[in-house]
Amino acid sequence: MSKSLEWDNLGFSLLPWIRTGLDVMGFETMTPVQASTIPMLAGNKDVVVDSVTGSGKTAAFVIPVLEKVVKEEANTSKFKKAHFHSLIIAPTRELSRQIESVVLSFLEHYPSDLFPIKCQLLVGTNEATVRDDVSNFLRNRPQILIGTPGRVLDFLQMPAVKTSACSMVVMDEADRLLDMSFIKDTEKILRLLPKQRRTGLFSATMRSAGSDIFKTGLRNPVRITVNSKNQAPSSLKLNYCVVNPAEKLQLLVSILNNYKFKKCIVYFPTCVSVSYFYSFIQYLGKRNILVNEVEIFSLHGKLQTSARTKTLTAFTDSLSNSVLFTTDVAARGIDIPDVDLVIQLDPPTNTDMFMHRCGRTGRANRVGKAITFLNEGREEDFIPFMQVKNVELEELDLEVKGITTNFYEDFRNWILEDRDRFDKGVKAYVAFIKYYSNHSATSIFRLQSLDYVGIAKLYGLFRLPRMPEITKYLATEKQEGIFPGNWLVDPPVNMDEYKYKDKKREKERQETLKNISLINDKKKLKSELKKKNLAWSDKTLTKERKLERKEKMSLKRKAIEEELKAEELDENAEEERIKEDWKEIVLQNKRKKVSSKAIQGNFDDL
């Protein structure tokens, strides 16, 4: 690393227009990762860069890419059509767009009299197909491609696209690109590219990729690790707060009311919980329970790409105090200026994602604060667990302030206004249980230790839903705060009279109720008839059994009589045969006597 972090001490002279871009963007000096990486990557070295979040990694690879495009004359008319010079891959559309914006920020200062340098974004959208991307590529002839693995792979496999001129590949958030979600696409992409190329891998959690980095075709790579006692930059303050899960939402509103911030990002565990709590917080804003006038935004992975882009742009460009409710879709690599507060309602299932979330604030030496809510009990072991990973968290003693109304009564009344809200609350609750069961740190985040009732109250449920985890939970021991039928309120809510605001849905519900009522009436009638006819049916059954026995006895008697008759006939026949035999014997004896007399007379004659 250079002794000085001045740009003049980089080891080579940056192109004048790149230097102008740095000045305009406010990069007065290099960060340690930039000072270490730029000379290596710009000078024919493969690099594996592991540096804390918010340390300027994007500029550390964008500058070498632009330098090489010029140095290798890819910015001339000699550069072949249907070829490209550099490929930058990122795991999400949002991060890809952000990298594109950094590249374009530098290109704004590119001399207009030179052959233009262009970049093209390759991300899946409903607005453009892969064929559209290829058409734009052939028409505009960009030297730099930026995109997500799936779309990049589809693009490179098109016959019209040539890959032989590609001399540099950069993988941002490389550990993510090498995990199970993307590894197949990433490997296929790299097989389509020339082996003689420069490769750069960048991430704040590069260590988690392990030996998978060697699947990227690195040749004698230089490993750059910006050492730090703490994974968080010094400008980022990491805090945690141990709280009863039922009070999390109220504490969140209290923080939004009492903390001074320009922009705040609140991380929720699931997409459905984002949209659910977003609706309620908007309701609180209308009722002036949110003291500070803040603009609330919602962003999650189930939204259409165009909606996500629009929301992220609106939040980034907002001049008023703003809060973004989101999931991990906005956790990696995204650089939003002026974010000075991050709140996590629950820790992420992947512990590596923890620092990526926190790292949305405290970037580029700006002051930032990240607060994580932990449930009381076993989850408190998360603190020493993160210490092993060089992440130090300081406990914050927070109290609910500035909420004069009965918060949970307001929450319940809001839910009772529309049955659809209750349905979404149940879905959010079930999704959270599944989310929690997939946690990587299973020794800390265990379903057996989860406060199911407290979580249910957080999501505004009136009763616990039917699911295997709840059945198991209730079977272990008698739980407090649960009334018969798994109700959490007494008296229970009359679900038959609980209506949807949407007239169409309510009409469907009423029809369903009628059908259920008819079915129940039929079952009831059948049951009553069964009871009424029980004595009669018993008598009939007894008569039938008697007749059956009589028939059996009659058949048996008949069979015995026939057998006796047969035996009698056999005896008579035997007597007749004996008589005949005696007659035959008598006749034979008579014949013998006659014969002997005849013989005797003849001898006398001699």
From Swiss-Prot:
Assigned GO CC terms: 90S preribosome; nucleolus; nucleoplasm; preribosome, large subunit precursor
Chemical reaction(s) catalysed: ATP + H2O = ADP + phosphate + H(+)
Coiled-coil segments: 539-582
Main location: nucleus
GO molecular function, one term: RNA binding
Impact when changing R360G: Leads to accumulation of 35S and 27SB pre-rRNAs and a net 40S ribosomal subunit defect
Binding site for ATP: S51, V52, T53, G54, S55, G56, K57, T58
Domain Helicase C-terminal, first and last residues per copy: 248-404
PROSITE patterns: DEAD_ATP_HELICASE, HELICASE_ATP_BIND_1, HELICASE_CTER, Q_MOTIF
An annotated GO BP: maturation of LSU-rRNA
Keyword tags: ATP-binding, Coiled coil, Helicase, Hydrolase, Nucleotide-binding, Nucleus, Phosphoprotein, Ribosome biogenesis, RNA-binding, rRNA processing
Class of enzymatic activity (EC top level): hydrolase
Position of sequence motif Q motif: 7-35
Motif (DEAD box): 172-175
Enzyme Commission number(s): 3.6.4.13
Compartments where found: Nucleus, Nucleolus
The Helicase ATP-binding domain, residue ranges: 38-224
Residue(s) carrying Phosphoserine: S254
Highest taxon above the source species: Eukaryota
Pfam families membership: CTE_SPB4, CTT_SPB4, DEAD, Helicase_C
Function recorded in the entry: ATP-binding RNA helicase involved in the biogenesis of 60S ribosomal subunits. Binds 90S pre-ribosomal particles and dissociates from pre-60S ribosomal particles after processing of 27SB pre-rRNA. Required for the normal formation of 18S rRNA through the processing of pre-rRNAs at sites A0, A1 and A2, and the normal formation of 25S and 5.8S rRNAs through the processing of pre-rRNAs at sites C1 and C2. Also required for recruitment of NOG2 to pre-ribosomes.
Sequence similarity: Belongs to the DEAD box helicase family. DDX55/SPB4 subfamily.
Quaternary structure, from the entry: Component of pre-60S ribosomal complexes.
Other observations noted: Present with 5740 molecules/cell in log phase SD medium.
Entry text on domains: The Q motif is unique to and characteristic of the DEAD box family of RNA helicases and controls ATP binding and hydrolysis.
Name the record gives this protein: ATP-dependent rRNA helicase SPB4
